[in-house]
């Protein structure tokens, strides 16, 4: 009996060990991409992106390990990494096969300055002419160098009455436009983006965030003593975490330090798109707000809302926000609809320990991890490529081709709302209004359904105008005819009476 029990126990133990050994492999192969349906329920999705490669110090063959890298910038087929802890910038080149290789290490420049090295550079940008702009945070300056690393000029702390004299200038993130104007996010300066003219002069603060406050807290502060006020939280604008200049010259700006209640109340936006007046022109017509995960509960030891630490935008107007809280990437289209969401915290490929920056070359995504000191490269899957093809074809006016691409995407993911809406929009442009209405109805798209219905009704009226006129005429003439017959009948009846 004991032998039987021992055998059963051994078999069970072996089964458990086998299960444990196979579970991680299953988890690794399982899709970690998701979206939301109309009701807000999470819907698993085929992967939109897959990991193409992960580059660490070893894979890149660096002379020494990266140390707390903070910035990433793509220019053509070149990728620039701010190796912040090593006080340098690494220039990488992408080969034909997509592999990255080191071009040079940039740790000093030529010029008649006392300090010609960097101290904790946190961001970099390259102009069309090849000039390099560097947020040299530790040296309290923004540098402009030519393509041969000759010093051109520097941008210093703004001279403005709103900035205290003892403020240390800490440029953190920057962007440049085609005219050579510089936009900077500086730690400790919450007036908005610092805008410099091409000659280095401070121009203005741009796009300061709205101040959100609790009315009860406001009343408390209004009637509090000076000592009590000093202990209370001040109602001040929130600093931006990062900025990105898109191909049209608009600035995407993200805010990581957001509160759940402010996001849900709509008093704060996690990402904005600023025009040259500093106005937020980001379209938010999506089913859900543009702030990452719509559920903010505790999971895996992480709680609170998504905290966007960087953003990048493709030429097809899809912009991707990087969440440093849960290590996820959220892609949105130009209407604010969620295109994809994927990622997570961890050590596996496609997961992150401390995502710091995001960039793109074509539609490939590059994510810099400041803790693991690695660059993860993502390429579109078949599903993702169908979606991008459909968007591009629609923008070119190739509506039939766009419809077919959306159909292929739908075949791979029958729960993908955008595919149904995309098919409907393509049919709408092809003037197939009745079919378009059917697709919009399936996904409860009332706005587009209304557009299709109005056109369908208009055409139906035009095609049946003769019948409509006939019915209207009959509606009016038949009662008149019946009345006339009755009148004649009464006259006849009266005539018969008088004859009698």
Regions found by a protein language model. Name each.
Residues 2-8, 383, 402:
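Generic alpha-helix initiation/capping and coil-helix boundary signal
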Residues 3-25, 475-481:
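Sec-dependent N-terminal signal peptides of Gram-positive bacterial secreted proteins and lipoproteins
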Residues 23-433, 443-444, 450-500:
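Eukaryotic scaffold repeat domains enriched in small/polar residues
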């Amino acid at each position: 009996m004991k032998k039987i029990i021992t055998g059963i126990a051994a078999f069970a133990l072996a089964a458990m060990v086998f299960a444990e050994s196979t579970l991680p492999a299953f988890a690794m192969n399982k899709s970690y991409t998701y979206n939301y349906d109309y009701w807000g329920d999470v819907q698993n999705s085929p992967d939109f992106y897959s990991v193409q490669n992960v580059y660490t110090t070893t894979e890149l063959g660096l002379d020494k390990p990266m140390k707390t890298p903070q910035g990433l910038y793509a220019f053509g087929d070149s990728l620039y990494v701010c190796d912040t802890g090593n006080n340098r910038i690494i220039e990488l080149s992408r080969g034909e096969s997509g592999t990255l290789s080191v071009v040079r290490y940039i740790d000093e420049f030529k010029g008649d300055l006392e300090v010609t090295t960097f101290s904790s550079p946190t961001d970099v940008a390259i102009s069309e002419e090849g000039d390099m702009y560097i947020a040299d945070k530790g040296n309290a300056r923004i540098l402009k160098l030519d393509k041969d690393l000759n010093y051109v000029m520097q941008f210093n702390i703004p001279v403005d009455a709103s900035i205290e004299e003892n403020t240390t200038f800490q440029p953190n993130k920057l962007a440049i436009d085609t005219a050579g104007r510089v936009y900077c996010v500086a730690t400790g300066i919450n007036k908005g983006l610092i805008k410099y003219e091409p000659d280095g002069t401070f121009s203005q603060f741009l796009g300061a965030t709205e101040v959100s406050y609790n009315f009860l807290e406001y009343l408390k502060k209004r009637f509090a003593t000076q000592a009590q006020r000093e202990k209370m939280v001040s109602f001040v604008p929130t600093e931006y975490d990062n900025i990105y200049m898109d191909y049209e010259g608009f600035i995407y700006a993200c805010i990581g330090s957001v509160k759940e209640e402010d996001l849900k109340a709509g008093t704060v936006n996690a990402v904005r798109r600023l025009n040259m007046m500093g106005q937020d022109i980001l379209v938010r017509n999506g089913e859900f707000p543009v702030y990452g995960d719509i559920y903010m509960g505790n999971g895996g030891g992480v709680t609170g809302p998504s905290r966007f630490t960087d953003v990048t935008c493709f030429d097809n107007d899809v912009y991707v926000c990087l969440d440093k809280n849960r290590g996820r990437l959220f892609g949105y289209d130009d209407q604010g609809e969620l295109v994809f969401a994927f990622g997570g915290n961890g050590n596996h490929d496609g997961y992150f320990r401390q995502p710091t920056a995001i960039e793109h070359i074509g539609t490939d995504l590059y994510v810099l991890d400041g803790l693991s000191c690695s660059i993860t490269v993502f390429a579109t899957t078949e599903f993702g490529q169908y979606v991008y093809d459909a968007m591009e074809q629609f923008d070119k006016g190739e509506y039939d081709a766009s419809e077919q691409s959306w159909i292929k995407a739908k075949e791979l993911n029958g729960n993908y709302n955008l595919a149904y809406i995309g098919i409907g929009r393509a049919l709408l442009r092809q003037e197939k209004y009745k079919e378009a209405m059917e697709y919009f109805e399936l996904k409860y798209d009332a706005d587009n359904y209304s557009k299709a219905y109005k056109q369908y009704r208009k055409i139906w009226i035009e095609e049946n105008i003769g019948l409509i006129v006939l019915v209207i005429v009959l509606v009016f003439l038949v009662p008149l005819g019946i009345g006339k017959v009755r009148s004649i009948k009464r006259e006849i009846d009266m005539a018969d009476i008088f004859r009698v």
